[in-house]
């Protein structure tokens, strides 16, 4: 069983990510992780932190000579700003007065749209600092690191590859649902785009919308999509609701900070179509295999992958750390106030696409291993090959 967990605070000394259940023999290096984290820092509209944030990666356990060992993998991502925060984020006790002065002073004006107020209520804090430190999207660096390990496993074991792109930012973006989907070979071109799209007209519209938001000291959300190619049919199951692949993918992507909606395939568009135009008809293919005339289901039927590309879309709300600050209540006085304004981005939609890609990779790896098992990548590969070879010829 593949399991993962992350630890660490936004301005703490380091983030730590762990993954257990990865088979031995997966080729992975520290540079692979660094390259993945660099992709997360890309995107027009990012804040000042992205300019100096250099993720210091250490593969602590589970990898030897560039190959996984089958034991738990631990990854440390150091914080280059840590020297500035050693007192504010000290794990050891500070003098009471010192702990409440200057930068250490409690943050008592919770931000609307953040975890601040409810987190303070839930965990008994009189300060938003402990809440915002862990709820910060900085934590997603850990998931991107783990997602890269999962990506390498998926490609090496079964040729599965993923790609992510941005559909829209602030309502501006790709204007046609018939725009060709990007493929795995388009990753470099997408990384080079300031807003992670292959559509140059849409790129101009999105950049202009971000510039407008910056000028107004505002923030923007958007819509992203992840596509997975090469996933064999039969991953996931219809027999229990909690083991359905679409449910797992939706939960994984919904768990990303600021994501407020997820759909598989055409999702909400399907609700407005008659049944005769909503499903993916099957015909005999030229190669003797079954072919589909469309992919409205997004590669998943009955909770299982059906062999077509898997498409997952997500809606990201605007970042709630707004430069001009929203109205709130100061919890120390009970009086109206302006919310605290932590350094943030105008938009992080392109980065969210990279994070969503990581979560799709982790979920696919988890369900692939649930189906095929294997202590080594060679064993998993043999199991997959045997499964595919077992299909009757007329059902391939």
From Swiss-Prot:
InterPro entries: Chorismate_synth, Chorismate_synth_AroC_sf, Chorismate_synthase_CS
Domain of life from the UniProt record: Bacteria
SUPFAM superfamilies registered for this protein in UniProt: Chorismate synthase, AroC (SSF103263)
SUBUNIT field: Homotetramer.
EC number: 4.2.3.5
An annotated GO BP: amino acid biosynthetic process
Gene encoding the protein: aroC
UniProt KW keywords: Amino-acid biosynthesis, Aromatic amino acid biosynthesis, FAD, Flavoprotein, FMN, Lyase, NADP
Family, as annotated: Belongs to the chorismate synthase family.
Cofactor: FMNH2
Name of this protein: Chorismate synthase
Cited PROSITE patterns: CHORISMATE_SYNTHASE_1 (PS00787), CHORISMATE_SYNTHASE_3 (PS00789)
